[in-house]
Amino acid sequence: MKFLVILTLCIAGAIAHCDKAPFIKASWNQVKHNEVDILYTVFKAYPEIQDRFPQFAGKDLEAIKETAEFAVHSTRIVSFMSEIVSLVGNPAVQSSIDLLLVKMANDHKARGVTKELFEKFNIAFMGYLKSHTTWDEKTENAWKVVGDEHHAIVYSILE
């Protein structure tokens, strides 16, 4: 029931936040091809996240950063984010965003990923965005408002 309430609020919020999409898309377009750097930043900030990936657990981050396996996995993660960003701001496809987030959250929950790990991922990711894009108050607000809605869906499943 909690999930359905959150989902309803997020759908309603999507209509109210169409004005946020240009800021999210503009900043994302500046970093969406930095897949390896984004995942490297997350792993560097939170090694416990790296340890959740069996193919990278216990390995030297500097060494794996240059591997094809790291590049492929980084691209998977960033491509998912790109898909979400491409849909943001269009109320007609809000249910698609919600379904993608639900599937991702369920997949990660099945692997034992916690809300706390997602929060840490987000902290590192947002830090990367802020330091690698043209960042201002409107951009920060857009990411916060839309991000909070998306995180509510994910966290309702991970809790």
Swiss-Prot record:
Heme b binds at H73, H108. It comes from the Eukaryota. InterPro entries: Erythrocruorin (IPR002336), Globin (IPR000971), Globin-like_sf (IPR009050), Globin/Proto (IPR012292), Mb-like_M (IPR044399). Residues 17-159 form the Globin domain. Keywords: Heme, Iron, Metal-binding, Oxygen transport, Signal, Transport. One of its GO terms (molecular function) is heme binding. Residues 1-16 form the signal peptide. GO terms for cellular component: extracellular region; hemoglobin complex. The keyword Transport applies. CDD domains: Mb-like (cd01040). SUPFAM superfamilies: Globin-like. There are at least 12 different components in Midge globin. Belongs to the globin family. This is Globin CTT-W.
